[in-house]
Amino acid sequence: MPELPEVEVTRRGLEPLIGATVTQAVIRQPAMRWPIPSHLPQVLHGARLLELRRRGKYIIARFESGCLILHLGMSGRLCLLESDTFPEKHDHFDLHFADGRVMRMRDPRRFGAVLWAGDQPDEHSLLKVLGQEPLDEAFNGEFLQQAIRTRSSPIKTVIMDSHLVVGVGNIYASESLFRAGIHPETPARALTLAQCRRLVEEVKLTLQDALQAGGSSLRDFFGADGNPGYFQQTYFVYGRTGQPCRVCQTPIAVLRLGQRSTFYCPACQQGQPPSNAMP
């Protein structure tokens, strides 16, 4: 699933459309994670795109007539193409603009979303429950320690909770915990303030590094311009089971947390060896 860096890379790739006017909205397949509203062609026709911003893993497109909320799901892409580009099998939604370009939703698994939010997108039920933006100043060590002080769940699971902090999925949680030297099974409430500060710092740095690399392209992700990301080439632990740690040469191990594969270095991330770890 695209995480914060991939969504932000996509948003930035669509920015050239700001100021353009919609000439046509085309719904080819309305059956996404939630049905694409059938009235979108009417409310978007003739509307100018005013703003593109990100909230967590959602992109909010503000038009003169209201706001679209876009989510890439597990395998979705938003492509910026020429309007005469012939649609492919999994191209489900188009926005054609007067300047001759089209924003196209491509989603083989159809877990993505195209929703209408009117004039108050932040009050939408999907957005108003979201936690802190990890790159904002408000997400700091003191905030994290206060938020997790009563939580006994593993810190890896907690840092992926979008009600606490948004956009930190499986890849970037694993990478950030490695950089911070924290075992993923550590109970969240056991972290000291110093550890919370270090973890917050590494979350921010990891996400910023991923943004600079254009995100991670493991299977489905490509930016709006069709280019892949390259951050996967620098992973410390994610997907590197059995390979030597880039720091200490210890083989990377994997365990299951919350139905997710969690990668870590047993030497660099000290903690009680977990019973369900697989070398």
Swiss-Prot record:
Subunit text: Monomer.
CDD domains recorded for this chain? Answer: EcFpg-like_N
Q: What's the protein name?
A: Formamidopyrimidine-DNA glycosylase
Reaction it catalyzes: Hydrolysis of DNA containing ring-opened 7-methylguanine residues, releasing 2,6-diamino-4-hydroxy-5-(N-methyl)formamidopyrimidine; 2'-deoxyribonucleotide-(2'-deoxyribose 5'-phosphate)-2'-deoxyribonucleotide-DNA = a 3'-end 2'-deoxyribonucleotide-(2,3-dehydro-2,3-deoxyribose 5'-phosphate)-DNA + a 5'-end 5'-phospho-2'-deoxyribonucleoside-DNA + H(+)
Q: Which UniProt keywords apply?
A: DNA damage, DNA repair, DNA-binding, Glycosidase, Hydrolase, Lyase, Metal-binding, Multifunctional enzyme, Zinc, Zinc-finger
Role description: Involved in base excision repair of DNA damaged by oxidation or by mutagenic agents. Acts as a DNA glycosylase that recognizes and removes damaged bases. Has a preference for oxidized purines, such as 7,8-dihydro-8-oxoguanine (8-oxoG). Has AP (apurinic/apyrimidinic) lyase activity and introduces nicks in the DNA strand. Cleaves the DNA backbone by beta-delta elimination to generate a single-strand break at the site of the removed base with both 3'- and 5'-phosphates.
- Describe the family membership recorded for this protein in Swiss-Prot or TrEMBL: Belongs to the FPG family.
